[in-house]
Amino acid sequence: RETVLANEVAPYAATDNVLAASTDVGDVSWKLPVAQCFSPCFAVGTPLHTWQLVSQGRTSIAHKGMLLAAKTMAATTLNLFIDSGLLQECQQEHQQVTDTQPYHCPIPKKVTPSPLK
């Protein structure tokens, strides 16, 4: 029988393929290195952006998966604080990418957000 949740860590595979998805980090990722983590929060094969996926968000599985992702990212951050060489490698890789693909913000400089009311 197939499992309904991912139950293994996929091996690292270097690739230049882009994962076409949206995130909330946009401009930030052009200023400093960012991380992304996938963890099992819903049944394998559930289409994204559907009510079926949303309905799984209140389950203990989703909660445990989110905690796993948070712990993974926190441990990664701790490693960067502990190992300054690793942090420098991340910064150098980021610099190499942004040097060859400079970022230009699509929002004109004269545009400013209105104050919250």
Task: Go through each PLM region and give its residues.
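Metal-dependent amide/peptide-bond hydrolase catalytic core
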Residues: 1-117
